[in-house]
């Protein structure tokens, strides 16, 4: 019984405890539910608040983006304007630099012109200091007389090239350029300008052009030296008219006239000697002597060209001259026919030395006294006489040799035939030789391969190389 009671009590206790536990559990659940309700409401409120803040941030960001886009557009517009301004400034800078360079060039040119003008003014002052007054009454009369005599023709000396192309001419005498002569109208203005010309101490005789006034009668007679002397006197009288107040000027005038007259006399005598030697020697010797004499003369002394003998192509006279020439050429070993060459070369050398001494004397007139001038005149006269004597000796010896040879009748027929063949063979290659001499600019030197024009620096292809005809 006791056990049952005790079991009943225990079961009751257990049941009571279980009931208490269930009640507690229910209470806890209800509390949790209440807590959950409060927490969800709060959480929703929090979420709403956060959403509002985010919306505000988005709106602010959009505003910032719009503002930044507007600023970017403004900056782009400013950049374009700055670039345009930069281009304008660059163009202006380039224009300014170009103007600066042109102005510098103009400044250099103006400085050069200013220097030239200053030099010209100095020279003008120097010339005005050294001006000597002149009178041109006599020169006017002489110019009018020479203009009324006949038309003046300029004589242009043609350079005759020698056969020996290796020989080169090394003369220091400058050739004066011949100019066409026109009748000079004498006016008061020209006379005033001529009065102010400078009488330099160094007298340039090469400045006067070689003018030959020839009429038909003078050409037929061969009188050329008179026209030359008249024209030279006219030019000298134009430039240097003696003045009573200036003894130095008178001495210069006399010295110049003497040198001119001596040079023209010597030139005429030399041409006569060359004509006589041409009649005696063969065609080869005639060519050599003419070229030799014309080479050695200065350009202001040359006023005649060596003319070939016209009697070579006329009938019986041709045969006689051919006989004499051929015989003289064959028997040059027996008779000393080389003397005319020697005399002629000596004449040419003497002429050259006389010309050089005369030019040197004319240059040193401003320094040397009058005694040295007279001595130079005497020396030139003695040399001209010695050259004349040598030429007459050579002429007499060659004439005697020709007379002795011309008497032999056995050589006549062979000489005539051979000379006819020689004249024909000589006349043919004349034009060819002249053309060959004019074509050749440099003798004995082939054209260099490196001096040719390069068409392209590109390497030639193999096919083109193989096609070459080497």
UniProtKB/Swiss-Prot annotation:
One of its GO terms (cellular component) is nucleus. The keyword Coiled coil applies. Shugoshin is Japanese for guardian spirit. It holds the Pfam family Shugoshin_C. Dispensable for both meiotic and mitotic cell cycle progression. Required with SGO1 for full protection of centromeric cohesion during anaphase I. Required to prevent precocious release of pericentromeric cohesins during meiosis. Acts redundantly to SGO1. Residues 131-143, 150-162, 370-381, 396-406, 423-438, 449-462 have a biased composition (Basic and acidic residues). Keywords: Chromosome partition, Coiled coil. Belongs to the shugoshin family. It comes from Arabidopsis thaliana. InterPro entries: SGO_plant, Shugoshin_C. The keyword Repeat does not apply. This is SHUGOSHIN 2. Residues 163-172, 382-392 have a biased composition (Basic residues).
């Amino acid at each position: 019984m006791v056990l049952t009671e005790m079991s009943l009590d225990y079961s009751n206790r257990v049941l009571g405890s279980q009931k208490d536990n269930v009640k507690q559990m229910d209470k806890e659940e209800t509390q949790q539910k209440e807590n959950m309700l409060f927490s969800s409401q709060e959480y929703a409120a929090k979420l709403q608040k956060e959403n509002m803040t985010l919306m505000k941030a988005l709106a602010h960001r959009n505003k910032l983006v719009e503002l930044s886009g507007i600023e970017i557009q403004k900056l782009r517009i400013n950049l374009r304007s700055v670039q345009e301004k930069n281009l304008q400034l660059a163009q202006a800078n380039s224009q300014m630099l170009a103007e600066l360079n042109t102005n510098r060039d103009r400044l250099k040119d103006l400085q050069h012109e200013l220097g030239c003008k200053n030099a010209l003014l100095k020279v003008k002052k120097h010339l005005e200091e050294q001006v000597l007054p002149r009178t041109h009454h006599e020169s006017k009369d002489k110019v009018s007389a020479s203009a009324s005599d006949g038309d003046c023709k300029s004589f242009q000396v043609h350079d005759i090239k020698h056969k020996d192309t290796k020989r080169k001419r090394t003369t220091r005498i400058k050739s004066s350029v011949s100019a066409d002569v026109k009748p000079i109208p004498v006016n008061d203005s020209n006379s005033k300008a001529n009065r102010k010309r400078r009488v330099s101490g160094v007298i340039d005789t090469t400045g006067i052009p070689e003018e030959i006034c020839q009429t038909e009668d003078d050409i037929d007679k061969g009188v050329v030296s008179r026209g030359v002397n008249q024209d030279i006197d006219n030019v000298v009288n134009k430039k240097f008219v003696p003045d009573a107040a200036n003894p130095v000027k008178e001495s210069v005038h006399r010295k110049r006239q003497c040198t001119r007259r001596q040079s023209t006399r010597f030139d005429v005598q030399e041409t006569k000697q060359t004509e006589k030697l041409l009649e005696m020697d063969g065609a080869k010797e005639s060519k050599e002597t003419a070229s030799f004499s014309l080479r050695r003369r200065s350009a202001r002394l040359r006023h005649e060209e060596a003319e070939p003998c016209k009697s070579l192509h006329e009938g019986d006279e041709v045969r006689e001259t051919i006989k004499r020439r051929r015989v003289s050429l064959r028997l040059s070993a027996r008779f000393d026919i080389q003397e005319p060459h020697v005399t002629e070369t000596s004449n040419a050398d003497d002429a050259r030395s006389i010309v050089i001494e005369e030019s040197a004397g004319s240059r040193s007139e401003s320094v040397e006294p009058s005694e040295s001038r007279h001595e130079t005149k005497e020396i030139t006269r003695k040399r001209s006489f010695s050259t004349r004597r040598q030429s007459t000796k050579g002429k007499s010896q060659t004439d005697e040799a020709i007379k002795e040879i011309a008497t032999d009748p056995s050589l006549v027929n062979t000489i005539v035939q051979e000379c006819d063949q020689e004249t024909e063979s000589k006349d043919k290659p004349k034009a060819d030789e002249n053309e060959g001499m004019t074509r050749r600019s440099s003798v004995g030197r082939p054209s260099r391969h490196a001096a040719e024009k390069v068409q392209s620096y590109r390497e030639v292809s193999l096919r083109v190389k193989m096609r070459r005809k080497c």
